[in-house]
Design a protein with these regions (language model features):
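Surface-exposed strand-loop-strand hairpins of Gram-negative outer-membrane beta-barrel proteins
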Residues: 34-54, 134-137
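Gram-negative (and chloroplast) outer-membrane scaffold detector with strong preference
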Residues: 26-28, 57-129, 136-139, 149, ...
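Outer-membrane beta-barrel translocator domains and adjoining extracellular loop/strand segments
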Residues: 39-45, 78-85, 124-132, 169-176
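Sec/Tat signal peptide C-region and signal peptidase I cleavage site
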Residues: 19-23
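Bacterial N-terminal signal peptides
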Residues: 8-18
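Subset of outer-membrane beta-barrel
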Residues: 46-51, 138, 148-157, 162-172, ...
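Outer-membrane pore/translocation modules
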Residues: 24-27, 36-47, 183, 190
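Bacterial N-terminal signal peptides that target proteins for export
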Residues: 1-8
Length: 197
């Protein structure tokens, strides 16, 4: 027969046993609006700029507060469109994530987070004039944050804000890494549907 002392010691031992932290993989399709900076700037004879964006993020959050993320966003008609063609901006960045899970990593929970990263910003226009058409690949950095709210173990929503800016001219140890004809910058606000695995 077990004594009350042995049972108490066993219960305390069970409660103090570390539970392994669970890593999360997040798939987040999103849509939103661009604003500020170059968002809404018409190029040449273009009209009807669109500030709409859509894309997808894939994040891996470790068992604590740190994670990594890949983010791809597309903004159609970013510089406007003509009767002949249009324009668009594509961003593809890799980011470091810091996010604190309130409520745990299963069931209902809230996770505010911040991101910082770098990647590619591709600007392209095909207005049919040849003179004002652009096709540029620039290095960009991004920073921002937001909050994810989970309604259960597998699904939630994300409110996200990010700022993107291309590097003007970047040199490391005298070696040119990026040479940009001009800075492109804008902010992106989006709403995403989060699938947690």
């Amino acid at each position: 027969m077990l004594s009350p002392r042995a049972i108490g010691t066993a219960l305390i031992g069970i409660m103090l046993t570390a539970v392994p932290a669970r890593a999360d993989t997040l798939l987040i399709p999103f849509f939103g609006v661009n604003f500020g900076g170059d968002a809404g700037t018409e190029f040449s004879d273009a009209f009807d700029t669109s500030q709409f964006n859509w894309g997808v993020s894939i994040a891996f959050m470790g068992g604590g507060i740190f994670g990594v993320e890949g983010d791809i966003g597309y903004s159609p008609d970013f510089y406007g469109k003509t009767d002949v063609g249009g324009s668009g901006v594509l961003t593809a960045t890799g980011n470091l994530v810091i996010g604190i899970p309130f409520g745990g990593q299963q069931g209902f929970g809230i996770r505010p987070y911040g991101i910082v990263g770098a990647g590619l910003l591709k600007s392209k226009s095909d207005f049919g004039t040849g003179v004002t058409d652009i096709d540029e690949n620039d290095l960009t950095w991004s920073a921002g944050g937001g909050v994810m709210m989970f309604f259960g173990t597998r699904a939630g929503i994300r409110f996200d804000f990010r700022y993107f800016q291309t590097f003007d001219d970047l040199e490391i140890l005298g070696v040119p890494i990026a040479q940009s004809p001009g800075k492109v910058d804008f902010s992106r606000a989006s709403l995403g549907f989060v699938l947690r695995f």
